[in-house]
């Protein structure tokens, strides 16, 4: 871990990394929460609670989060916001019984995400203030997160369905792969395996698992 106080902590990507990145720290917290569920180790629960508190306490007044704490990381995008919300949602469902305003944080965060990162037709924006570039990773993360979050906020199912429809119509090649980006100048059709194809496969699986209304 990189930052630690009596009440908070933040995990780093690696032992050598010095950046404080919110979604990365929460991924570590998810792993510890699962280990706590399996072992009942109370020390793990304390670590999870402190790391969750760190992120909740840094939620901005509008409901969003910067990517990280350094000045060069003080921007927001669609998929990192989705990652943060999803981790908080999963940690809530672990039933850790921690004294934190998790539901209030989720409500505020989901409101911000829905209001700032999607157009009415399902286009996934990259930044709150800019649609372009429309990125396949933004689309995939949004679909998966929205469908999973729909158990907490029913709007998630509609968001996930709308983004999926838009993505298939606008970013799926007739050969079956998904394009990398749509910029203001046009489509970048490179089929990146991890960034695009793997994440869209995950998104499609999440959609099929959660969908109740049909595409």
PLM features: what roles do these ranges have?
Residues 1-215:
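Glycan-recognition and catalytic cores of secretory/periplasmic carbohydrate-active enzymes
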